[in-house]
Every structure is written in structure tokens, then in C-alpha cells.
Amino acid sequence: IALESIDSHTYQNYFGYILIDHDVDVKKGIKFVKKALEKEPNSIAYRDSLAWGYYKQHDCKKAKTIIEKLKDEIGLEDLEMKKHYDAIKECK
């Protein structure tokens, strides 16, 4: 199965996040996360993945915009999101 043909937004985000988080191919990871967001645009996890991808690309402005909105919406109870928030907050 070609990964590009996977139609499940859950798997698209998961695969994208793995590519991003492990610095395998951040650009490609963001592409997969954006595909997932097309199907679930309000997903907290998918938006967090996208913010993390932008952070990994040193696009601090985009990362901060997304992560601040998430913090305002749901707070920082999720440990993974809090880790991302703390790192992105320091991004320059």
C-alpha cells in the first residue's frame, strides 16, 4: 500500500506526526497532517501536530498562532501538548 493513498485521517495524522517528531521528513509529515485536517479541521491532536511541524521547520509565527489557539480552547492538561507549547513558546 502506498502511504500517500491512505484515506484514513487518523493514520494520515499519525504517520505525519511520526515523520515530524522523529525528524524523518518534516515537510512530508506536515503534508500528511494537512490531509488529515482537511477531513477533521477542528481536531485538537491534528492541529497540535501541525504546530509541532511548523516548530520543527523553525516557522515560529505559524507554530505559535496554532498552539496559542489550542491553549485558549482546551488549556494545557494534555502532557504532550504542554511539552509542545513550552517548546514553541521559546521558539525564536
What is each model feature region?
Residues 19-20, 54:
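Residue at a conserved register position within TPR or TPR-like alpha-solenoid repeats
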